[in-house]
Amino acid sequence: MQPNEITFYQRFEADILAGRKTITIRDKSESHFKAGDILRVGRFEDNQYFCTIEVLSVSPITLDELTEQHAKQENMGLDKLKEVIKTIYPNEHESWIINFKLIG
C-alpha cells in the first residue's frame, strides 16, 4: 500500500470529493509541492486514503492577503478561513496556497 502524501481534516473530505474545495493553505513544511505533482490524499485523523489530486500551483501568501476568492475556493467565508488558519498555524505569518484539482 502506498503512503499518502498529503492529508486533510476529515471535515473537508466531502468538499474535496465534490470539487467545492480547490485550494489548501499550508505552512512552510508543505511548501515543497510543485505544479504537476500527483498526490495521494488521506484523512488527517486516520490517514485513510480517499482521493488523488494534481497540484496546479503553489504560492506564498499572508493572512492579510487572503480574499473572498480564496475563501470560496476553500468553501467557507473569509472570516472563517482566517480563523481556521490561525487555529491550525497559530505562530505562522506566511502560508502557502496549494491550488489543486481532483483527478481520482
UniProtKB/Swiss-Prot annotation:
Keyword check for Transmembrane helix: no
UniProt keywords, alphabetically: Hydrolase
A Pfam entry, by short name: ASCH
EC numbers: 3.5.1.135
Active-site residues (renumbered): 21 (proton acceptor), 24 (nucleophile), 74 (proton donor)
Molecular function via GO: hydrolase activity, acting on carbon-nitrogen (but not peptide) bonds, in linear amidines; N4-acetylcytidine amidohydrolase activity
CDD domains cross-referenced by the UniProt entry: ASCH_yqfb_like
SMART domains: ASCH
InterPro entries, sorted: AC4CH, ASCH_domain, PUA-like_sf
Source organism superkingdom: Bacteria
Domain ASCH, first and last residues per copy: 6-96
GO cellular component, one term: cytosol
Reactions that this protein is recorded to catalyse: N(4)-acetylcytidine + H2O = cytidine + acetate + H(+); N(4)-acetyl-2'-deoxycytidine + H2O = 2'-deoxycytidine + acetate + H(+); N(4)-acetylcytosine + H2O = cytosine + acetate + H(+)
PANTHER family linked: UCP029143 FAMILY PROTEIN
Family: Belongs to the N(4)-acetylcytidine amidohydrolase family.
Function comment: Catalyzes the hydrolysis of N(4)-acetylcytidine (ac4C).
Protein name: N(4)-acetylcytidine amidohydrolase
Organism this protein belongs to: Haemophilus influenzae (strain 86-028NP)
